[in-house]
């Protein structure tokens, strides 16, 4: 299932009433603005990480950053860790989102990168195998979805009704094809750009 904004709104607001959904979409749209950060010209490739520690997500600065992005921090603490490392003699910390191969996507206010190996993240629910999987490009998208779902359906967010895959880059879409083959329904929440549309086409094949 591709990137249909109405379908996404139905999931987020727990409603099938289209006029209500359109109103909620309109209310949210004016607040969307692109934000970009730079961190000099430093490249955070895997060999540059030294004294790496993965701990519980607790840094006030990181939690404040997530709050500014509209992310529920309790959900973030459940889904993410905190990476502390040294780079070029300086100590840094970042939000760390685990993947299926033991690596992490890392991000803070000033940079984003990964701790190799770079892979997809697959969040499977316990118990009976789920028939549906929701797929996201990045973990901030995933956390945003969970946050909105909790805000709009606080009594019954149904987080465990489906599994989730986070690509951690649209370049990883081929790595997601095999695990996605076991699901009856796949819902993709990608950016409405060329890369996102190409990723959807690969999944549909």
Model-derived regions: residue spans:
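Short, aromatic/basic amphipathic alpha-helical patches
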Residues: 177-179, 198-205
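Serine endopeptidase catalytic core focused on the charge-relay Asp
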Residues: 63-75
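Acidic, metal-coordinating catalytic cores used for nucleic-acid/nucleotide bond scission
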Residues: 169-173, 190-201
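Phosphate-handling DNA/RNA-contact segment within nucleic-acid enzymes
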Residues: 85-179
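Non-catalytic accessory segments of DNA primases and related replication-initiation nucleases
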Residues: 1-65
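Short, basic/aromatic recognition patches
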Residues: 72-90
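Terminal peptide-recognition signature
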Residues: 9, 66, 137, 145, ...
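Acidic beta-strand-to-loop metal/phosphate-binding motif
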Residues: 135, 184-195
């Amino acid at each position: 299932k591709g990137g249909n904004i109405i379908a996404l709104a139905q999931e987020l607001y727990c409603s099938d009433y289209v006029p209500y959904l359109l109103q909620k979409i309109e209310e949210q749209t004016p607040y969307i603005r692109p934000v970009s950060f730079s961190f000099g010209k430093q490249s955070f490739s895997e060999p540059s990480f030294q004294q790496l520690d993965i701990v519980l997500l607790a840094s006030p600065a990181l939690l404040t950053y997530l709050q500014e992005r509209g992310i529920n921090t309790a959900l973030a603490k459940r889904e993410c860790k905190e990476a502390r490392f040294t780079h070029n003699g300086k100590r840094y910390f970042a939000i760390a989102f685990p993947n299926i191969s033991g690596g992490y996507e890392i991000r803070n206010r000033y940079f984003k990168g990964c701790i190799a190996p770079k892979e997809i993240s697959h969040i499977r629910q316990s118990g009976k195998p789920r028939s549906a999987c929701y797929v996201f490009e990045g973990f901030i998208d995933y956390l945003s979805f969970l946050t909105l779902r909790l805000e709009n359906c606080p009594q019954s967010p149904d987080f465990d009704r489906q599994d989730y895959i986070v690509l951690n880059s649209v370049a990883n879409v081929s790595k997601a094809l095999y695990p996605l083959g076991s699901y009856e329904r796949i819902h993709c929440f990608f950016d409405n750009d060329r890369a996102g549309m190409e990723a959807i086409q690969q999944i549909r094949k």
